[in-house]
Amino acid sequence: MTGSVTEVGFRWSTSSGNLGNTATGTLNGTPFSASLSGLTAGTTYYYQAYVKVQGTGDKSSTVSTFYGSTNSFTTSSLNTWLSNYEIPATTVASLSESNTLYEGRYCHDSVNETYGNTKACRYNTTDANQKVVTHTYSYNSKVVRNYSFLYDKTYKTALWVAYATSNSGDFKDNDVGRNDAWAYDPALDQSWQQNLSGAYSSSNGLRYDRGHQVASNDRQTTVEQNKQTFYYTNMTPQYSALNQGQWVELEKKVQGVATVTTGSDTLYVVTGPLFEGTLASATDKSGATCPAPSGYWKCLMKCTFSSPGVMSSAVGCAYLFDTNSSNIAPTVTTIDAIESRTGFDFFANVPTSLQTTAESQSYSFF
């Protein structure tokens, strides 16, 4: 068919079999282009170019459309705090450029930190009773991630807490001390949280402490960074003898590894509770009861970088406390074993070639 071109463009969609969206192109010779908007990050799109041609002579009232072959492209993932190496794989609700942008990273929304002049970033998950939060602090004129966690409204507990540490750069140990700045976490509604303005009441003959998941001594870079470890969301009802015994001993050993982790090395830590079997309960300052974990675990991965963003090696190990009612030393195990126990996929952003070996190792760092 001969005639004149009246329109060019693309039809497109996330489904190759249903290209229902149209973007009209600019008719200015060949090739032509069109702009697409409202795309979702990390998504594959399919498209076909089209040309509309109006006939001549006795076909002048006829407009025919010709289509090219189907092609595809994938949009880049949005930069989020969830892309850091310490973060377990967590299914969050979709993000787009219409969501909150903070310091070059996207989240569903953000809120001012109680301590410091930065913001906490909040992510919705596919479970309405769970949210992911990343706390941040300011150091050396930039915003730095402090720690992230997956919080569960039912247990009123973070199911995992993840952070990076070393003795250089953004996490340098400046020995700012313990600030005891107990406070509700500004990133979550207070109804989701335990009231830990004071100690737990004794329950079933067990005395529970407000047990840190990220230890105060793990965060010694700035005062604000340390204070954020006293948010109630970072606490669990932990058997007092365990919290002040084998648990703190493990924390000290982790801090010892962090102290000698400098330069191109970073230690990534994920810790969390177990909720298995019949659970004891603890009573907070408001008289509300909450489940006490049945045990705890801690996973470590020490990574070396040959250049910024290029990881060259990784070693891993894990520690398991099978009980929250005695002061028994942890069992040395593998990250794989903790993944099987909890259902989480740890260190999901570490390259698979390094992650697989590191997660199957069972020797202790100390």
Feature locations, PLM:
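Domain-level detector for secreted/extracellular nuclease and nuclease-toxin modules, and
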Residues: 74-366
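Short, surface-exposed linear motifs at loops/turns and structural transition points
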Residues: 1-77
